[in-house]
Amino acid sequence: MLAPSRLGPYFAKMAIREILEVPDSRLKIVSTVVEPHEFGPDLVTLVDDMFETMYDAPGIGLAAIQVGVPKRVLVIDLQPDDPDAPPVECGHDHEHGHEHTHTATKKEPRVFINPVILDPAGELSTYQEGCLSVPEIYADVDRPVTCRVRYQDLEGNTHEEALDGLMATCLQHEMDHLEGILFIDHLSRLKRAMVLKKLEKIRRIA
């Protein structure tokens, strides 16, 4: 008989986990801090599963709550895993009028545990964002162009890092999930209602 996970039943071992989609109420849960005693094999398994799930979707970012785990953990990888693939268009910066593309290289997985934004810049940039929890829906969202983040790695070590461009946008998007916020929550009530109606229509067709 296996010993129960220290992190509870959320951390059942599996490779590709189910991604929660709106209107699942669990997406509105505020995630809790990963405590010192929770760093260990179970956390590594969760992160491995999150990457596997994100790549399978596919996506470039995923928060733990999106797979039903209300912990302050997120993973990001802006790169595909095909050296022969063309550059990937990740979004349009309407403020500065250019596409953000990234040359296809090997995977560059990033893990952020207990992330905290220290000083978001005042300048905003508009990206067309999407989300694995709101499939096939895209909308313009304004976010700070740069930010400095403090976070822990899988060993519990603390780091500080300045981010900009798509990485800054993706980090802020995923950190919203930790507070129970979806990118569509940044839209006006009318636009959000239209988006949800469109999503219902897509699901009916599917």
Which ranges hold each PLM region?
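Active-site rim/adjacent substrate-binding subdomains
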Residues: 6-172, 177-206
